[in-house]
C-alpha cells in the first residue's frame, strides 16, 4: 500500500543497482514517488516489491566522468540521491587512489553542482541527498574509502551554505552490500529509516548502531558549518 510522502515527485538515485539503492527505491515507491534509476551499464533495473510485483522504474545509463550528459535529466528531477561509490578495501596504489577520489568524491561533487545549478522556474520542491557514510567520522578499515568520503563530506558542508534548496546528508552504518560484505545491518531497514527521518524534516540523517556516530557527526557538521561560514565569502550573485 502506497503512502503519499513523495507523491508526484520524480526522484533519481545513483548507485541504484546496489543493495541500498534498490531498497531506497522500494521505500520511495511506497511513498508514491516516480523513480529514476541511474546506473552504470545498459541493463534496465528490474525492481520488485515485497510481494514480487514489478515496480515501475525508469533506468538511465551513465558513466563516471560523463556527468554533464545528465544535465537535461537532472533539471527534470525534484530530488537527486547521490549514492554511488567504490571501496578498494586495503589497496593503496596509484590506480586505487585515483578511482576512490574520482568515483566517491569528484563524481559526486560534479552531480551536486549540476543539480544545484539546474533551473527551477516553477519554484517546485527540490532537494538533494548525499550518502557520505559514517566513514566521515569513524574508521571504515579502508583508508582510501575514508579519505574520499571525508573529503566529500567536507565539500557537502561547504556547498550547502549557498545551496538554493535542502542538501541532506545520509550518514549510514555498515549494511550488507557489495561494497561492504561484512556489514550486519539490513539495507531494507536502513532505507526505511532514511525515508522516515527525511519525512520528519531532518537534513542530517543518521542510521547507525554506533553511539559515537550519533555523537561525533552532529558536532562535526556544526563545526564545519561555523568554520566555513567564518572563513569563506558568499559567491557573487
Segments the model singles out, each with a brief description of its role:
Residues 89-90, 120-161, 174-179:
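Catalytic loop of short-chain dehydrogenase/reductase
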Residues 85, 100-112, 148-149:
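Short alpha-helix in the Rossmann-fold core of NAD(P)-dependent oxidoreductases
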Residues 165, 177-228:
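C-terminal helical subdomain
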Residues 90-104:
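Short alpha-helical oligomerization interface
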Residues 49-68:
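Rossmann-fold cofactor-recognition segment
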Residues 14-27:
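N-terminal Rossmann NAD(P)H-binding glycine-rich loop of SDR-like oxidoreductase domains
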Residues 14, 77-86, 104, 130:
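Rossmann-fold scaffold of SDR-type NAD(P)-dependent oxidoreductases
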Residues 30-47:
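Conserved glycine-rich Rossmann-like NAD(P)H-binding loop of the short-chain dehydrogenase/reductase
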Amino acid at each position: 500500500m502506497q503512502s503519499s510522502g513523495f507523491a508526484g515527485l520524480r526522484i533519481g538515485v545513483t548507485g541504484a543497482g546496489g543493495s541500498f539503492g534498490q531498497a531506497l527505491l522500494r521505500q520511495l515507491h511506497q511513498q508514491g514517488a516516480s523513480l529514476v534509476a541511474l546506473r552504470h551499464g545498459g541493463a534496465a533495473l528490474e525492481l520488485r516489491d515485497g510481494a514480487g510485483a514489478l515496480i515501475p522504474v525508469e533506468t538511465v545509463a551513465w558513466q563516471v566522468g560523463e556527468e554533464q550528459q545528465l544535465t537535461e535529466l537532472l533539471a527534470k528531477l525534484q530530488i537527486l540521491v547521490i549514492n554511488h561509490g567504490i571501496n578498494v578495501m586495503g589497496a593503496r596504489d596509484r590506480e586505487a587512489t585515483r578511482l576512490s577520489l574520482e568515483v566517491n568524491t569528484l563524481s559526486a561533487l560534479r552531480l551536486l553542482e549540476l543539480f544545484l545549478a539546474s533551473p527551477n522556474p516553477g519554484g517546485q520542491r527540490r532537494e538533494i541527498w548525499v550518502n557520505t557514510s559514517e566513514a566521515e567520522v569513524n574508521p571504515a578499515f579502508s583508508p582510501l574509502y575514508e579519505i574520499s568520503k571525508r573529503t566529500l563530506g567536507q565539500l557537502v558542508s561547504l556547498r550547502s551554505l549557498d545551496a538554493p534548496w535542502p542538501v541532506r546528508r545520509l550518514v549510514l552504518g555498515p549494511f550488507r552490500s557489495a561494497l561492504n560484505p561484512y556489514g550486519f545491518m539490513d539495507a531494507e531497514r536502513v532505507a526505511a529509516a532514511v525515508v522516515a527521518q527525511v519525512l520528519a524534516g531532518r537534513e542530517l540523517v543518521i542510521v547507525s548502531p554506533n553511539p559515537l556516530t550519533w555523537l561525533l557527526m552532529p558536532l562535526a557538521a556544526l563545526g564545519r558549518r561555523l568554520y566555513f561560514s567564518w572563513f569563506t565569502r558568499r559567491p557573487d550573485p
